[in-house]
């Protein structure tokens, strides 16, 4: 039972189902966890999306002489802040600082970036109706941020970088007209979210509990009471998150990437226990023009890892552990080659 509870917590990190619970007690965790290098400068950057103002951070090289490429970094699921860390109670499960570190390294490579706090964090949480929030709202936020950056004369071209759920958001945003020269999908699923979630559960639940999950999740998505399900899975089926999950579940990333009109870079860690290499290869199969980079040692937050689930836990919580050295050069080189 104890091991199941630990697994249940890890499952929350791959879906946005948890954002309504954790965000209720969250404050914006947009502060830098570690000091950025002197080679970069950071400035506040905010943009409007509908009635909301989404706060973020602009990171640039401390010295530059011409217009820079710029990336909009889009966070993964749950109450994940601009730096890649979970807010509220889930902070103990995810404090990798991935997006801040990526931004600093991109700046050192001559690429500016903006990372932002999603709409379910901080003051904006009080301005939205969680029960009416859909994945399309998050896609609209990406488009709004992209349009502001594309109009900024400091920048030469815009790339969208999304991690985990954010990979699907940037793909959808580009397909809906976000003015991007290309998109980067980090640890992005290649199947509908419910298929990904079921696969994870199948590795961790006894068969009888998996059967209950299948029935309960189907009822949940139909708008009915989920009914009998293991207590550790109930946070995944909260009524307040139903609309979000209904709208997310209808999208298939493989179908969406096949429609992509801009270049795509897919980056995947071979030791990612949340999104497998098969997902990355499914994305490339659906869009053969996409470039795929598999980093052999990397996990979901791009730290060197084994396949041991418990050993990986520390890699999510210690921001001082270095990001794998292959990550940023793969992204930066690809961006610089884009026309």
Regions from the PLM with identified roles:
Residues 98, 131-151:
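Alpha/beta-hydrolase active-site loop
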Residues 301-302, 307-339:
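Catalytic active-site module of serine/aspartate enzymes centered on a nucleophile-bearing elbow/loop
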Residues 262, 275-285:
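Short alpha-helix in the alpha/beta-hydrolase fold that links the catalytic acid
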Residues 260, 266-268:
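Short beta-strand/loop motif that positions the catalytic acidic residue
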Residues 147-203:
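Primarily recognizes the serine-hydrolase "nucleophile elbow" in alpha/beta-hydrolase
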Residues 28-66:
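N-terminal cap/lid segment of alpha/beta-hydrolase-fold proteins
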């Amino acid at each position: 039972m104890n091991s199941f509870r630990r697994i249940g917590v890890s499952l929350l990190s791959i879906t946005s189902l948890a954002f309504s619970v954790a965000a209720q007690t969250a404050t914006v965790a947009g502060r830098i966890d570690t000091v950025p290098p002197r080679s970069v400068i950071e400035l506040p950057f905010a943009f409007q999306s509908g009635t909301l103002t989404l706060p973020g951070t602009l990171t640039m090289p401390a010295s530059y002489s011409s217009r820079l490429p710029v990336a909009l970094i889009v966070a993964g699921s749950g109450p994940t802040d601009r730096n890649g860390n979970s807010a509220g109670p889930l902070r103990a499960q995810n404090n990798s600082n991935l997006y801040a570190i990526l931004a600093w390294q991109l700046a050192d490579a001559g690429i500016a970036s903006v990372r932002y706090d999603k709409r379910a964090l901080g003051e904006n949480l009080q301005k939205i109706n969680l029960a009416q929030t859909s994945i399309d709202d998050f896609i609209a936020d990406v488009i709004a941020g992209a349009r502001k950056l594309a109009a900024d004369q400091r920048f030469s071209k815009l790339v969208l970088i999304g991690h985990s759920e954010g990979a699907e958001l940037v793909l959808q945003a580009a397909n809906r007209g976000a003015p991007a020269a290309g998109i980067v999908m980090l640890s992005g699923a290649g199947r509908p979210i419910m298929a990904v979630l079921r696969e994870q559960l199948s590795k961790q639940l006894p068969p009888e509990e998996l059967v209950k999950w299948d029935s309960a999740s189907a009822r949940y998505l139909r708008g009915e009471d989920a009914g009998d399900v293991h207590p550790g899975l109930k946070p995944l089926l909260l009524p307040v998150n139903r609309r979000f999950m209904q709208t997310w579940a209808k999208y298939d990333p493989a179908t969406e990437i096949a429609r992509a009109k801009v270049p795509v870079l897919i980056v995947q860690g071979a030791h990612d226990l949340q999104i497998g290499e098969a997902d990355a290869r499914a994305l490339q199969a659906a869009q053969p023009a996409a470039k795929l980079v598999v980093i052999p040692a990397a996990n979901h937050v791009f730290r060197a890892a084994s396949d041991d689930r418990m050993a990986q836990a520390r890699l999510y919580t210690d921001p001082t552990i270095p990001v794998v050295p292959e990550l940023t050069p793969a992204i930066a080189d690809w961006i610089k080659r884009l026309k």
